[in-house]
């Protein structure tokens, strides 16, 4: 899932506050 307070974009968290990372997170969720 996506946690916007996390500034990471890895296979564990799949998220960060960067737009590209958010999109990546949403598609790979």
From Swiss-Prot:
InterPro entries: Huwentoxin-1 (IPR011696). Keywords: Calcium-activated potassium channel impairing toxin, Disulfide bond, Ion channel impairing toxin, Neurotoxin, Potassium channel impairing toxin, Secreted, Toxin. GO terms for molecular function: ion channel inhibitor activity; potassium channel regulator activity; toxin activity. It comes from the Eukaryota. It is found in: Secreted. One of its GO terms (cellular component) is extracellular region. Expressed by the venom gland. Disulfide bonds join 2-16, 9-21, 15-25. Belongs to the neurotoxin 30 (phrixotoxin) family. Insect-selective neurotoxin that potently blocks insect calcium-activated potassium (BKCa) channels (Slo-type) in cockroach dorsal unpaired median (DUM) neurons (IC(50)=25.3 nM). This occurs in the absence of any shifts in the voltage dependence of activation. May interact with the turret and/or loop region of the external entrance to the channel and does not project deeply into the pore of the channel. In vivo, does not show toxicity in mice after intracerebroventricular injection of up to 25 pmol/g (1.8 ug/20 g mouse). Negative results: At concentrations up to 330 nM, does not show activity on transient 'A-type' Kv, delayed-rectifier Kv, voltage-gated sodium channel (Nav) and both HVA and M-LVA Cav channels in cockroach DUM neurons. The presence of a 'disulfide through disulfide knot' structurally defines this protein as a knottin. This is Lambda-theraphotoxin-Ec2b. It comes from Eucratoscelus constrictus (African red-rump baboon spider). The lineage of its organism: Eukaryota, Metazoa, Ecdysozoa, Arthropoda, Chelicerata.
């Amino acid at each position: 899932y996506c946690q916007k307070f996390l500034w990471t974009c890895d296979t564990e968290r799949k998220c960060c506050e960067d737009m590209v990372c958010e999109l990546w997170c949403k598609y790979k969720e």
